[in-house]
Amino acid sequence: MNEKWIVERVEREGGRLWLYVNDAPVPLARVTPKRHMLVDSDALAFAYILETDDRFLYVMIPKPWWPELKAALDAKEPVWLRCGERTLELEQFHDELSYLLENIRGNANYGEALEQAVQDVFFEQ
């Protein structure tokens, strides 16, 4: 079974971007970064994939947090996940996000709403 963890808030602190989730059904100590991201066009969210021995978990980053993603990307700040007192670095986050952004830009296959949202947040000056 695959589960989604929705990012509830973000914070740039100590040279890192922190993504906060509540009530993770699996302890962070039992997950490892998959080093891969997807996009949910319907929800206007990026999804970073984590894995355990028996399932994939999706850290969903909705559009309201994208300006902070862009700032962290521009500053090359590493991205970390926090649930309670546990933390986990989301390895290769910037490489994966950059790849997705370039693929979405000008590509109607992702849907007009997502394409426009990405353009507005990540490519408008």
Curated annotation (Swiss-Prot):
It holds the Pfam family UPF0738. It comes from the Bacteria. InterPro entries: UPF0738. Belongs to the UPF0738 family. HAMAP family: UPF0738 (MF_01861). This is UPF0738 protein GK0828. The lineage of its organism: Bacteria, Bacillati, Bacillota, Bacilli, Bacillales.
